[in-house]
Amino acid sequence: MGINREEQFLCNALAEVLAGKEPPHPEKGTDMDRVLELAYAHKVHPLLYECSDWEEVSAEWRERLKRESRKIVSQNYRLLFLTKYLTSVLEENGIGTAVLKGVGVAQLYPVPELRKSGDIDLLVSRKHLAKAEELMKEAGFAREEEQWTRHHVSYVIKE
């Protein structure tokens, strides 16, 4: 079973965008609404922002791409600020961290701000975990009541 025209176009467009190039225009008969539905389902739609002005893109999707991209950029700046804040608080207290996924992976994108992310993943050594948790509480974060896994601890910011 092969991939259809829309899936092939999405893969080609993403490859070009991630290489820092303009995405190709679709072949005649390519259903751009379907392409954008796929991109949205895989959370890579912000990478197709440049396509939003193409005539092949419906007005509904054009507006949605622009709106979603602006929202993602805003969320990412907030996450970037919080990441820098948390890592500096921890490092000032002798706790080294490694940033996983999110901000770190975004640097691989041609436009890092368009990498969709919803949280901050920090790796802290087990021996520093108790102190890190204390510092996060002092910084305005609260431990989530329900922890879904054993390999990490989830916090939310108190707002």
Regions found by a protein language model. Give the residues of each.
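Generic secretory/membrane-interface signal
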Residues: 1, 113-115, 146
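Helical scaffold of the NTase/Pol beta-like nucleotidyltransferase catalytic core
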Residues: 2-101
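Residue-level detector of solvent-exposed, low-hydrophobicity positions
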Residues: 16, 51, 68, 116-119, ...
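Charge-rich, low-complexity amphipathic helices
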Residues: 57, 61, 112-113, 158
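Short, glycine/charge-rich beta-strand/loop segments that flank catalytic centers
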Residues: 70, 100-111, 147-155
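Conserved catalytic core of two-metal-ion nucleotidyltransferases
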Residues: 75, 79, 83, 137-159
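Active-site nucleotide-donor binding segment shared across nucleotidyl transfer reactions
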Residues: 82-134
